[in-house]
């Protein structure tokens, strides 16, 4: 029989004023791709320092650019001009991730709430489990 949970008072959540500041996570391709996705979903500019130049990062950048996110290299790092949580645009062409599985999976989640059609391609992707 499931245990019942009693909450003494209702829980509420308030809107945040936003985040600002600096964060230095360890260098990792997953963290870099996740940072790109979060920056794209945020509204406004984010500068990512120390982003890698590997296949995963390149695939994520190209996919985000195809959906209207401006990403450029500055003296401080990669500047990502995010479009907001539901601001991505429908890509005109198939998003090709080649063998970059991590950005493919994360991009699937990023576009899921959007109402546009999108097509994804990948080759030599590792098995998922």
Segments and roles (model prediction):
Residues 1-129:
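Short, structured segments at the rim of ligand-binding sites
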């Amino acid at each position: 029989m499931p245990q019942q949970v009693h909450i003494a008072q209702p829980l509420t959540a308030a809107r945040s004023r936003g985040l600002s500041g600096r964060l230095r996570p360890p260098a990792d391709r997953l963290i870099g791709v996740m940072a790109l996705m979060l920056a794209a979903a945020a509204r406004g500019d984010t500068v990512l320092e120390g982003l890698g130049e590997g296949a995963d990062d390149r695939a994520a950048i190209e996919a985000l650019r195809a959906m209207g996110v401006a990403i450029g290299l500055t003296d401080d790092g990669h500047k990502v001009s995010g479009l907001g949580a539901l601001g991505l645009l429908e890509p005109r062409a198939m998003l090709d991730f080649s063998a970059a599985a991590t950005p493919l999976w994360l991009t699937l989640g990023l576009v899921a709430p959007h109402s546009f059609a999108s097509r994804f391609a990948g080759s030599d992707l590792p098995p998922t489990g």
